[in-house]
């Protein structure tokens, strides 16, 4: 798969929507594969290293990421968006002791729990950098 197809987050959103509609283990692995090769947007405060936004719900802290900038909507507050490889976000979530990574939390949310981080990180990339 060409990395350019992953660029706008559309493929990631479609994989998540398919999983939500046809919730199965196979579709979950498709989402994980797509996440493995995705660049996502992470809210953070400019000028402050490792100062990321968290969504707090029922005593848990989730690191939100967005498939593209539009998915954040008007909820930016004092945060800017940094574009990162999803596997780098996993490292940040571990470092911050997040209870999970919440993809597109304001539209069609998909939760990646800490127990799945290694599964995603160890997947072989399916993208090529050249068109």
Model-derived segments and spans:
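An interfacial alpha-helical scaffold signature
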Residues: 1-131
């Amino acid at each position: 798969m060409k990395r350019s197809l992953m660029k706008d987050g559309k493929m990631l959103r479609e994989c998540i929507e398919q999983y939500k509609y046809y919730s199965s283990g196979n579709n979950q692995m498709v989402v994980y594969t797509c996440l493995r090769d995705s660049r996502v947007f992470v809210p953070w405060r400019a000028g402050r290293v490792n100062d990321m936004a968290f969504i707090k719900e029922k005593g848990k802290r989730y690191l939100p990421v967005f498939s593209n900038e539009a998915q954040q909507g008007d909820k930016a507050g004092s945060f800017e968006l940094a574009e990162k490889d999803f596997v780098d976000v996993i490292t940040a979530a571990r470092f911050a002791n997040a209870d999970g990574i919440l993809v597109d939390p304001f539209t069609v949310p998909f939760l990646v729990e800490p127990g799945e981080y290694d599964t995603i990180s160890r997947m072989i990339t399916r993208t090529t950098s050249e068109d």
